[in-house]
Amino acid sequence: MAAGCLGGQRAGPLSGTVLGNRWAWLIALPLLLAAAAAQGSVCRLKTGDGRESESCGTNLELEHSFELDDSIDFKKRGSLFWSGTAEQSISILQKQLTEDERNKLRDIANLNGLYRIRIPRKLGISEEVNEYVTSFVRACSMVESHLSDEITVHTDISGNVIGVSIVTFPGSCNGAEVEDVDLEMFNTTVHIQQPIAAAVPETAAFIERLEMEQAQKAKNPQEQKSFFAKYWMYIIPVVLFLMMSGASDAGNQGGNGGGGGGGGGGR
């Protein structure tokens, strides 16, 4: 994959004419975009607030397949433009379905067939050895949604493509009649789904709080004593008093029992 964008190609022989003439630059831009897109890297010219700026990113080819015999034959559906900014935005440019494609999609929907899409996992590699990620929906849901779908590109934490998914709105098949004009243009929303980092344990804060508690205990050693160590001088007298009271009660009960037995023997 070639490195850099069009911004790095302005120092060539065209710089004196292309940059010096705004209209010449606008005419030459599509040719330069096509050359860059073939290498997987592309830049786009944006106009806003009276100023022009470039947005560089990656061009991913989106392909689809829907065949009557349930075979797989992917053909180009459009292109995904993946910006290289920190926001990781993504947009899509798609082809219009031909009359033959619309008729074939209807036939496949009637046969309860599948509609498949795929995008490449890596750039700068020939199609013969490239790897793809794929997804599919029922062709009937694609028809009854009037080609309204949502495509999500899943990436790892480094931004590498690891999967793709597609859903339609609505996603059910109810046998509704669909006009031919509703199957001409795709109405697609695209997203990038990156992994959400797990919550990091607050180890430093926990250690700091633990050290503060230990320092506080060192200043107040009295707080470290147990309940018995703090109040033993009150507990022991109470225990001794209870023990002595119990022994005295037991002696009185024994004396009363002996006297009663002696009286019974005198009769």
Curated annotation (Swiss-Prot):
The chain crosses the membrane at residues 227-247. Residues 1-38 form the signal peptide. Residues 248-267 are cytoplasmic. It is found in: Endoplasmic reticulum membrane. Keywords: Endoplasmic reticulum, Membrane, Signal, Transmembrane, Transmembrane helix. It is a single-pass type I membrane protein. One of its GO terms (cellular component) is EMC complex. The keyword Methyltransferase does not apply. Its main location: endoplasmic reticulum. One of its GO terms (biological process) is protein insertion into ER membrane by stop-transfer membrane-anchor sequence. Pfam families: ECM10. The keyword Cytoplasm does not apply. Component of the ER membrane protein complex (EMC). Belongs to the EMC10 family. Part of the endoplasmic reticulum membrane protein complex (EMC) that enables the energy-independent insertion into endoplasmic reticulum membranes of newly synthesized membrane proteins. Preferentially accommodates proteins with transmembrane domains that are weakly hydrophobic or contain destabilizing features such as charged and aromatic residues. Involved in the cotranslational insertion of multi-pass membrane proteins in which stop-transfer membrane-anchor sequences become ER membrane spanning helices. This is ER membrane protein complex subunit 10. It comes from Xenopus laevis. The lineage of its organism: Eukaryota, Metazoa, Chordata, Craniata, Vertebrata.
